């Protein structure tokens, strides 16, 4: 499983990547496009059952499931037209199986926001719009080809043109491809959808990046998190609360130190563990 970590510049993508992989490889700087070429890291999936089995069999040999994370360059408006690092950004996402969308849910002027203020819904819509526009071009081109082939009497092409046009209309309304009512019983639809590799057809996990204080207070007092959580629920997606900076700070802690830290915070598991498991 390969997951792309995406989000607007300065929302905490590289900080989160550093914490996930327990490295300092991804330069986390306070300016856009700090991550230009994607950083890649492979991490094991936490599994208490595996630890228990190793204890029972008295062995140190464990082979956990692994997840590959890719830190992808920050996005700006116009990426679908090649603005900023748009072409590179979209190409990197296309190579991933799923998306971890990091959304800024913390206030503060020490870290600049490219739009000047914190608004997670606007930020999500900015990225979604660019991904949808990219998908729309792919679907429109294929629909046109199928419609042209259908004029020669190709019934299969005509059928494809019909559902592709419906998908084109769906995307044109600003909706993600993953919410399109695909006919799973139609092998041709399923195959073509897979061939197109649409960006918005990929599963998404929202990582709500907030302050350590908000995590300690139970997140109920953070309206930004509540907004993202509702949006994710409406989409049928997951929303994981996380403090990327704190996770980076404790990345090198021993298991015992992390356990003590979690107890002090009043939480059962780190946001990173929850994110990796959700992947």
Give the positions of each predicted feature:
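Conserved G1/Walker A P-loop phosphate-binding module
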Residues: 1-112, 139-141, 145-146
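Conserved Switch II/interswitch segment of TRAFAC-class P-loop GTPases
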Residues: 41-46, 73-83, 94-155, 170-186, ...
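Residue-level detector of functional hotspots within protein domains
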Residues: 22, 29, 55-61, 84-85, ...
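Amphipathic alpha-helical transducer elements in NTP-driven molecular machines
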Residues: 33, 47-50, 63-69, 83-97, ...
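C-terminal-of-GTPase-core extension/linker across diverse P-loop GTPases
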Residues: 2-6, 11, 17, 145-279
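Alpha-helical scaffold segments in soluble metabolic enzymes
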Residues: 15, 52, 126, 138, ...
């Amino acid at each position: 499983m390969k997951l792309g970590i995406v989000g607007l510049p300065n929302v905490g993508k590289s900080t989160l990547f550093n914490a996930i992989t327990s490295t300092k490889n991804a330069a986390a700087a306070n300016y856009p496009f700090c991550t230009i070429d994607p950083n890649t890291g492979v991490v094991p999936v936490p599994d208490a059952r595996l630890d228990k089995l190793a204890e029972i069999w008295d062995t140190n040999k464990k082979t956990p499931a692994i997840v590959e994370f890719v830190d992808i360059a920050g996005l700006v408006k116009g990426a679908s037209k090649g603005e900023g690092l748009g072409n590179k950004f979209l190409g990197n996402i296309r190579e991933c199986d799923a998306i971890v969308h990091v959304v800024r849910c913390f206030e503060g002027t020490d870290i600049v926001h490219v739009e000047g203020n914190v608004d997670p819904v606007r930020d999500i819509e900015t990225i979604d719009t660019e991904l949808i526009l990219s998908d729309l071009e792919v679907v429109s081109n294929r629909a046109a080809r199928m419609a042209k082939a259908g004029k020669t009497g190709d019934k299969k092409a005509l059928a494809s043109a019909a559902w592709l046009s419906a998908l084109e209309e769906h995307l044109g309304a600003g909706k993600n491809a993953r919410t399109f009512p695909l006919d799973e019983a139609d092998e041709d639809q399923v195959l073509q959808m897979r061939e197109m590799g649409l960006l918005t057809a990929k599963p998404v996990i929202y990582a709500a990046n907030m302050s350590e204080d908000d995590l300690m207070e139970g997140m109920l007092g953070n309206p930004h998190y509540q907004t993202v959580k509702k949006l994710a629920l409406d989409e049928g997606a997951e929303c994981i609360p996380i403090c990327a900076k704190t996770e980076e700070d404790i990345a090198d802690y021993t298991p015992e130190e992390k356990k003590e830290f979690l107890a002090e915070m009043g939480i059962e598991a780190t946001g990173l563990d929850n994110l990796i498991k959700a992947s």
